[in-house]
Amino acid sequence: MDETLNDLAAHVSAALSGAVLGSLVAHGELTLQIDPAQIVKVATFLRDDPACLFHCIVDVCGVDYPAREKRFDVVYHLLSLKQNVRIRLKVETDEDTPVPSICSVFPGANWFEREAYDMYGILFTGHPELRRLLTDYGFDGHPLRKDFPTTGFVEVRYDDEQKRVVYEPVRLPQEFRNFDFLSPWEGVEYVLPGDEKASGQPPVPPKAG
């Protein structure tokens, strides 16, 4: 399988000079790093080339790396039923730089790109209707960014007296905790069930006889 994926990476890189910035085969999967300006060209090639025929778009999603200058990855997953293989495309961008929409190539990307915009604030040029998909119309911020507060900015509830949904400032019943979202250790719990029974000493073997 790895040989097939390496051959596919070489084929795409040779056909699209300059569009493929890097490739990686790991765990039986091929990932191509793509120049954002070339994503539509790459998607079209992968769909139409006889050696590819990636006709199915599985997903488009965002990933947030706050410490990076270009903090977002836009990740595309495509499937070729003809070749029985999947491919992953990645492009890097920031909060202000839009990525070309691939809706003209894969119409099914429409809601995927809207979700990435809603959850991360990633912008897509050429999208037919780039608006929020999962959050409310007046929602403030993008909830899957790692610097988005876990409490949110407002509470939403139904007021029976007013007979409508109302928005109120968040009320915290305990002191606010500043979550260090860049630390790999924040929130890690190493105490496992049964650890409280351990004495810290190795068990004593039973006496013979």
Curated annotation (Swiss-Prot):
Sorted UniProt keywords: Cell inner membrane, Cell membrane, Membrane, NAD, Quinone, Translocase, Transport, Ubiquinone
Cysteine disulfide links: none
Membrane-topology descriptor: Peripheral membrane protein
Domain of life per record: Bacteria
Entry's EC annotation: 7.1.1.-
Membrane-spanning ranges: none
Gene Ontology annotations for the cellular component aspect, listed alphabetically: plasma membrane
Keyword Coiled coil tagged: no
Keyword NAD recorded: yes
Catalytically driven reaction(s): a quinone + NADH + 5 H(+)(in) = a quinol + NAD(+) + 4 H(+)(out)
Location(s) in or outside the cell: Cell inner membrane
GO molecular function: NADH dehydrogenase (ubiquinone) activity; NADH:ubiquinone reductase (non-electrogenic) activity; quinone binding
Subunit structure, interactors included: NDH-1 is composed of 14 different subunits. Subunits NuoB, C, D, E, F, and G constitute the peripheral sector of the complex.
Entry-linked HAMAP family: NDH1_NuoC (MF_01357)
Protein task: NDH-1 shuttles electrons from NADH, via FMN and iron-sulfur (Fe-S) centers, to quinones in the respiratory chain. The immediate electron acceptor for the enzyme in this species is believed to be ubiquinone. Couples the redox reaction to proton translocation (for every two electrons transferred, four hydrogen ions are translocated across the cytoplasmic membrane), and thus conserves the redox energy in a proton gradient.
Family: Belongs to the complex I 30 kDa subunit family.
Record protein name field: NADH-quinone oxidoreductase subunit C
Source organism per UniProt: Xanthobacter autotrophicus (strain ATCC BAA-1158 / Py2)
